[in-house]
Each structure stands twice: as C-alpha cells, then as structure tokens.
Amino acid sequence: MREEIGFFQPRDAPRLRPSHSGPSCRQGMTAPAPPFFRIGPARPVSPVVLSIPHAGRDYRPELVSAARLPQAALETLEDRLVDRLVWRATANGATAFIARAPRAEIDLNRDEREIDPALIAPPLPAGGLVQSARTRGGIGLIPSRITGLGPIWRERVTRAEFDRRVGTIHRPYHAALEAALEYARVRFGAALLLDCHSMPPRPGAAGHGEAAAASVIFGDRHGTTTSADLLDAAVTAARALGYRTACNAPYAGGYVVARHGRPQRGIHALQIELDRALYLDADLRAPGPGFEGVCRLIAAVARALEERLLEIPDAIAAE
C-alpha cells in the first residue's frame, strides 16, 4: 500500500507544489517517478537548502511483500512527518529535497558502502565496504533488523535490486543536493544544508528550564561541517522560541552532513534532530498540538542561517 506524501499547509500557507526532477514524458509515455520531491523555485532565492531523507512513505507493494514484518513495523524507521514541518521555511524561500522512498528501502543518511555484505545475494565483495556499529546493528544502508522485532526481510536482497536502489534513489538524491548547494554557493557566495531529522521522545524534553532534556539537537560533526558562528545562529534562533537545545550529543550528524559539508569551500552542513513529542500526538503518528510551533522553529532557524550566510561574503571581502 502506498501513502503519498502530503504537505501540511494551514489555510494561511501559500499553496506549494512539488517540482519533480526527472525525464519528461514523450509521445504519451509516463516518466518514472523521481526518487525525491523538490520544493522551491527553479532559481533559488535563498542559500539554505533543506534535506529530509527519512520521511519517505512510498511503500511499494514489492517492498512490503518482501518483508517478514508488517508495514507498520517498517514505518517505525521513519522520521515521522518531518517532511510536513518545512512548509514555512520553503514558503520563505528555502529549497527542500524530500525523499520518496522509505528508510526501510534505503537509508539516504548512510554511505553507499556502509552495508552488511551478507545481506546481498550474491554477497558483495567485502573489500571497500564500510563496516560500522550501524551495520552490525542492522541499520546500515539497507536496514536489516528492527530492535525488538528481529530481521526485516524474508530473503536476502538480490544484487540487481541493491544496484537499482543505489543507482536510482541514493545517488540521484545526493547528486541533487550537491548541485543545489553548488548553485547556491555560486549565486550567494556561501550555502548551507540543513539536514532535518526526528528522534524518539527524550525524558523531560517537553519541559523547560535547566532540568529539561534538550528537545532540539544540532550536529556539525564536532565543528567539521559548518562554522561556529552558523551553529551559534541556529542555536540562538531555537532558544529564542523557548526550545532547549544541545550540540553534537547524542547526535553529532550523519553521512549527509559529512558528505556535503565543506566549510572551506563555502558550503556548510548542519543536522537538526527534533524530539517527536514536540510535534506529534501521544501515539507519535499524527500532528500534535506543537506541530505548528515546530514549523515556525524550522523556519526561524533557516532564516537565521540565511541572514548569517549572506553576511559571509561581505566579511571575507572586508578582510
């Protein structure tokens, strides 16, 4: 069963339409669905690019039938409804790239080499692959296990299917991010990728003050993917709205920011993790009372980053 991505747009929001990348239709032929939605103007008006890699909900029947677990279990891997949180930021000019494929099919926040070779039939050559705690824990490029539920797949993934997922989903997504960031850098002098994720509820995160756990985590891989002043701008914007923040703990940023963040070239990358209790209902399935507030949070962070980015070329010129 497929669930098309819906964009949460209150009545006062401008009506946004996804701009699809991909081949055009010719002579009545239907073009294949692109691996992502692109939201934003064809000619970017902001140096901020948003990435939402874990909110895809296009569960192909073939994928669901290949799983030994029900679709509801596969959905627990999602960053639930994070795609619907970015409408205010895109209405303000940011460009967003939103994955269509669910994380269960392929994890866009993993290196394409970060996979258990035994998951593929015939097995991939071990040389050149990246083995990590994530692959050993079943959450590599293609997730293989869900904690508490066991193995996901009835059989190993064929090499042809593995190559299809990498070639038609993973690589095009990252190529699109790279192109958008480079375009923004050339046009504005600097660019930033804000990689948007959500995390399981943290005890105390719904509270305020020093005793409350941080509900918004920013990650720049310990200062390697963005400048300190940009991180400070994001933190300041979130705290101004009353959110408690932390940096790099427990989430320092994943493959997306590591791959695309090149501060020395004027391309920065910052991960934001949002406690799901902030914006979902008690069942963590549907929008909750705080949903619109988190939409405003992301927009405020994106705007603060944009303002600081636009100052960077002037600062360099003044040196």
Model segments located where?
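Extreme N-terminal basic, low-complexity initiation segments
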Residues: M1-D12
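N-terminal polybasic/positive-inside topogenic patches
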Residues: R15-P23
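N-terminal catalytic or cofactor-binding beta/alpha core of small enzyme domains
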Residues: C25-L193, S198-H268, L274-E319
